[in-house]
């Protein structure tokens, strides 16, 4: 008996590393020291920083992986993984530095795994961060054959005096919503139940334009790092930011609001994508659950002074991100939790 007969193919692992090497190295920034194969990834801080703060985040893709693996779509979930981590850390105004990934599978499928890593590398390039290292664990008997799970870890950096922590937010500020690409990577346990109820498959289409349902559900999560860095470098005054993930607007926008502030949202200020209407109708999902599960077309929020709202929206559109003024900050009794008016509580 040997390791391969026990379910772990070391040679396939080596071939996999060689296949992904070029994609990984293409993400490297000038600060990266060394290459693949070491026990740890090495990277220096960007030159010229005065008082840098490191910002870290970790996340996964959830049960979107189940749907992606059923339909042989692997590259997109790699982008999703980067987006779920990077979109969190950039809310502080930090620029992504490096990313690490962890993949676990029952049996290494080099082609599928390579597609995932190539997607991760794609997301890293779009976000300006280096894919500094990773781990692929082959765990026969623990994961089902042909199934894998992935997790990501991101570190970003911001000057201490440029940190955006929401403390400058005040009543009267404007809330700008930046468009999502669709469901992103949250709510897929509910999505999969709706698909099951509707007997949907790879050939199912929806909406007036008869769009491919599965294709739209698996659209990669939008990356906002380049947009945020552009806004900061353009001198836009950003008081706060929120990544709209699980819990939707009602549970994520309040996370960036300081004590004494709430927000009023105008749900008619943007057009809810047809995909969410299909999910609601096919699954008979109550309106409140829809708001507290999905992003409903808003993947990221920017809180800015009212005088800056038009300029910020124009900057967003100039970077190919659709954006709308969706609400404003209101006052709240100190000590009370921030709430959103205009959406189901």
Swiss-Prot record:
Enzyme Commission (EC) number: 6.3.3.1
Source organism superkingdom: Bacteria
A GO biological process held by the record: adenine biosynthetic process
Top-rank EC class of the record's enzyme: ligase
Family: Belongs to the AIR synthase family.
InterPro entries: PurM-like_C_dom (IPR010918), PurM-like_C_sf (IPR036676), PurM-like_N (IPR016188), PurM-like_N_sf (IPR036921), PurM_cligase (IPR004733)
One cellular component term from this protein's GO annotations in UniProt: cytosol
HAMAP family: AIRS (MF_00741)
Entry annotated with the keyword ATP-binding: yes
Organism phylogeny: Bacteria, Bacillati, Cyanobacteriota, Cyanophyceae, Synechococcales
NCBIfam families xref list: purM
Subcellular location: Cytoplasm
Main location: cytoplasm
Reactions that this protein is recorded to catalyse: 2-formamido-N(1)-(5-O-phospho-beta-D-ribosyl)acetamidine + ATP = 5-amino-1-(5-phospho-beta-D-ribosyl)imidazole + ADP + phosphate + H(+)
Keywords: ATP-binding, Cytoplasm, Ligase, Nucleotide-binding, Purine biosynthesis
UniProt key word Cytoplasm: yes
Protein name per Swiss-Prot or TrEMBL: Phosphoribosylformylglycinamidine cyclo-ligase
Gene Ontology molecular function terms on file: ATP binding; phosphoribosylamine-glycine ligase activity; phosphoribosylformylglycinamidine cyclo-ligase activity
Organism per entry: Synechococcus sp. (strain CC9605)
Pathway named in the protein's UniProt entry: Purine metabolism; IMP biosynthesis via de novo pathway; 5-amino-1-(5-phospho-D-ribosyl)imidazole from N(2)-formyl-N(1)-(5-phospho-D-ribosyl)glycinamide: step 2/2
